[in-house]
Amino acid sequence: MENSTSLKQEKENQEPGEAERLWQGESDVSPQEPGPPSPEYREEEQRTDTEPAPRMSPSWSHQSRVSLSTGDLTAGPEVSSSPPPPPLQFHSTPLNTETTQDPVAASPTEKTANGIADTGTPYSDPWESSSAAKQSTSHYTSHAEESTFPQSQTPQPDLCGLRDASRNKSKHKGLRFDLLQEEGSDSNCDPDQPEVGASEAAQSMLEVAIQNAKAYLLSTSSKSGLNLYDHLSKVLTKILDERPADAVDIIENISQDVKMAHFNKKLDTLHNEYEMLPAYEIAETQKALFLQGHLEGADSELEEEMAESSLPNVMESAYYFEQAGVGLGTDETYRVFLALKQLTDTHPIQRCRFWGKILGLEMNYIVAEVEFRDGEDEEEVEEEGIAEERDNGGSEAGEEEEEELPKSLYKAPQVIPKEESRTGANKYVYFVCNVPGRPWVRLPSVTPAQIVTARKIKKFFTGRLDAAVISYPPFPGNESNYLRAQIARISAGTHVSPLGFYQFGEEEGEEEEVEGGRDSYEENPDFEGIQVIDLVESLSNWVHHVQYILPQGRCNWFNPIQKDEDEEEEEEEDEEKGEEPDYIEQEVGPPLLTPISEDLGIQNIPSWTTQLSSNLIPQYAIAVLRSNLWPGAYAFSNGKKFENFYIGWGHKYCVENYTPPSPPPVYQEYPSGPEITEMNDPSVEEEQAFRMTQEPVALSTEENEGTEDEDEDDED
């Protein structure tokens, strides 16, 4: 302590001389090398300029303190020749840059000290040192910072100011050096230990802050299920992979693309099956419709065939229906037109008509109504032959079974046979396809049982002809049969024409009229047309030109009581037993060409509605007829031409919700008789009365038996 106080006094006495020598040295620019700086200057510069260094490298700080202490003791009178220190600045530059910041050249002893310092702190991290320096203890440098901060901010060129600053600085240097020596002598612990603990606390706080920030970025959104951390990672990855120009201008679009990528189907390592979109598949199938041969160089025979072609002018009918607000659109109508041409070219068709379109849940049905030429309907003949063989085989097998098994008392109702081809409900043949360009499929003939059951159920079409129809009552067939039954019902109820367009032939006999009405007609060549206003104002100017379907399921009534010879014999036996045969009245419906004004409505709802296609230009408008019983059925007429069209779900209008019919009554399994008739048990009084009546009878029988035995003994 005595050495430190004596050194402090000498330093205060020598400070004025050191300041004068500094200014003289700068003015004279002596070529000689200046003396080495004082140890106090080196220690103060190291403590102020590189304050974090002792905390990062404890070994270096210890060596520097040892060098400073030994330097103070061995400096001698040469200390007074050291120049005054420059103004201090607050920065954390490494120790090896101190010589460049000092305006006065360093002495060899200072270079040696710097070299020792450099070797003592290898691989120092400036980032860690700067962060640790902010949180280190401040009781070592608080006085130095308070004295040097004003000097560094406001440097004055005045000599007096420099002298005062150097005097105050030297005082603080001595005081700080004394404190360091007192700490080194009084305590054996390292002064850097508090700084190490503070750095560890700072690192732990930094890690916690980083974890909290990352947890916030990883928080999942309640709407999209994404988090910001993954999204930013993907955005940056996409930018670095693609490296677009001016990425900062399109970063919003890149972020949107990254979000949209979540909705795309991710491909795996397996080879996925090539899936053709339905639109492309339909386009491929419809391409064949447009690859038709040109008409250049056509022969005269081809021209005659074109003149007698059975292909209808679908585009003309679509033009009129478009005025009524009904149709499929120009594109689809033209494709249907080409599909009908393909149908007429591949089949011997005499007459063809676009019937309409039935909607389905999965696919729709495009329906074509055709009539084959005479003798060309070979498929129908084959079907009839196969059906007859099945009936004959079934009857033979049934006879064999009847011989073996006892006769059943149950009499099944007679099956109503279907109508022959070209008559009744099977007058026309219908082809369907799901999309124009796909193969046309012929629908089977309809049977009365299918029509009767179709009236009791209501099912949506699926678009697949082989689909099963699950309903109650059970439908006898699949969806193709159900579709054919609905087409027959819709045609019978909605196909109408202007009055006088058709007429009955003169060659038909009167017997047909008496039996069941006429079933054929022909076009009237003398038809002059009806005014459009008359067609709209009166429903009597429209007539049905399709036969009415009877409740039996046929257009022509069939008598189920017609019996063969064997059945007549059985009927005679039943009459002898007293059983009366059943009689069924003949079903009669409205005849052909009956005005639609006689049609029955549903609960004050008329069956038909008429209107003009345009009320603004009535002189060029057409008459439009809409069915209320079959929604989707339309008809138009411009006075001379007419056409019918249907587009809908194939269901009849129902005021109330559909309710399936109730099941039929239970059939009696066994005939009732006295042998199996159950009676109530008698009471006690009834049993006693019965016994009283039975006792005299029993006594009389015993007496009779006794007399008989005596007579036998006498005879013996």
Curated annotation (Swiss-Prot):
Compositionally biased residues, Basic and acidic residues: 8-23, 40-52
Gene null: resulting phenotype: Mice show hydrocephalus and the tracheal and ependymal cell cilia show clockwise rotation motion instead of planar beating. All three types of radial spoke heads (RS1, RS2 and RS3) are missing in the tracheal cilia.
Keywords, in A-Z order: Cell projection, Cilium, Cilium biogenesis/degradation, Cytoplasm, Cytoskeleton, Phosphoprotein
Segments for region (Disordered): 1-167, 374-413, 564-586, 668-716
Bias (Acidic residues): 374-386, 564-585, 702-716
Tissue and organ expression note: Expressed in the trachea, ependymal cells and oviduct (at protein level). Abesent from sperm (at protein level). Expressed in brain, kidney and testis.
Pfam families, alphabetized: Radial_spoke (PF04712)
InterPro entries, alphabetized: Radial_spoke
Transmembrane portions of the chain: none
Biological process per Gene Ontology, one example term: cilium movement involved in cell motility
Modified residues (Phosphoserine): S395
Residue ranges, compositional bias (Polar residues): 58-72, 90-102, 127-141
One GO term describing the cellular component: 9+2 motile cilium
Location within or outside the cell: Cytoplasm, Cytoskeleton, Cilium axoneme
Described purpose of this protein according to its UniProt entry: Functions as part of axonemal radial spoke complexes that play an important role in ciliary motility. Essential for triplet radial spokes (RS1, RS2 and RS3) head assembly in the motile cilia.
Subunit comment: Component of the axonemal radial spoke 1 (RS1) and 2 (RS2) complexes, at least composed of spoke head proteins RSPH1, RSPH3, RSPH9 and the cilia-specific component RSPH4A or sperm-specific component RSPH6A, spoke stalk proteins RSPH14, DNAJB13, DYDC1, ROPN1L and NME5, and the RS1 complex-specific anchor protein IQUB. Interacts with RSPH1. Interacts with RSPH3B. Interacts with RSPH6A. Interacts with RSPH9.
Family, as annotated: Belongs to the flagellar radial spoke RSP4/6 family.
The protein, known as: Radial spoke head protein 4 homolog A
Organism, scientific name: Mus musculus
Gene responsible for this protein: Rsph4a
